[in-house]
Amino acid sequence: MVVRGNTQSSTDTIWSYQILTKIQALQQTNTGFPPGIFPSTRVYAYNKNNSKNDPNVFFTGLIVHTLKKYHKLCTPYQQRIINQIVKDGLSSVGVFKNKSGRDTYNFWRTDTPQIFPNAGWLNKFDKSQSLPDDFDDSVILLWAQEVTKERAAVVHDTMQLYANTKVKSIKNSLPAFKNLPAYSTWFGKKMPIDFDMAVLCNVLSFVNAYDLQWTASDSASLQLITTAIDNKWHVTKADFIAPHYAKPAVIMYHIARLLTAGNQQNIQTLIALKPILLKQTDSLLANSKDPLENVLLSSARVHFGGIPIITSQTPDQAAIEQSKYPFFIANMASMLPSPVKRPLSKLAFAKFEYRCPAYNLALLWENRYLCVPLHK
């Protein structure tokens, strides 16, 4: 246990307040975005100078969820800031909801179908090529809104219809997963089955947080996660095993989040891997060069049983806020058959990297809380 004086505690509380007010300020400067939606940009990986505003709901859902997680432990004034951020952030999520009324969500707004907003000639295909709702945004937004268990259970039932082997089988994963009835990433019936290890972590986090009835597809999804860890594929084949996240540090963060979500009785096989995950995380930390990557790994290692890395050095807030390390990636090769997917997944011309300064700050705020409790 680290005993800190009142001066350090006050400094941490002020620091927390400053981060929250900066996050709120970023939310209020979102010209060109729906009200309350945090600004994010889409960067073409092949040409990093090609950056476009991307009005998605993904990062807003993550920020709301992250801040709400620690709300009860904040000072009353900080709670008021978080309350306003949450209220504003959730005010526009309805335009991203399934246009037929189903309780699922899309990455982009559904009232005016789009693919890659502000993409010039690509937007001629907005209606014909618009993406279906996805599991990732759906569970993130339902969780952020704290929907009832009854609503969560209905969506969970719907998910069972989109698992591998239900109607079609995956054609672009590792041989070990070919017949595994794990969840696809998409709700669309016309979409090929698409596995993403990080997305599956989010889905199971949602299932456990709501203590929903565990299904065969939940078990299969957990099996995919633990098999990948056993074989270290989340490190050596990150862009293949999690094509929409693609970075080992980001995958580690998602695994850690699953290990802290709700009822843990169904994930004992994953809990048993915490010592291995801690060792892998420390190895990645030793070679990390990006400040945001450091934040993700530092947060993950605490949940894997590591002793918090406590430092008196003030984090480089500006460097983390403007980090070019991508938390999320649009990988156009992710749905191609295996022989094509494997090489193309590594190439920059098939990817768009997403950045959100406000979410970077939320991750930093969370990390500081985990490593040095801010409000004690």
Where are these regions (language model features)?
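Preference for long, amphipathic alpha-helical scaffolds in soluble/luminal domains
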Residues: 4-376
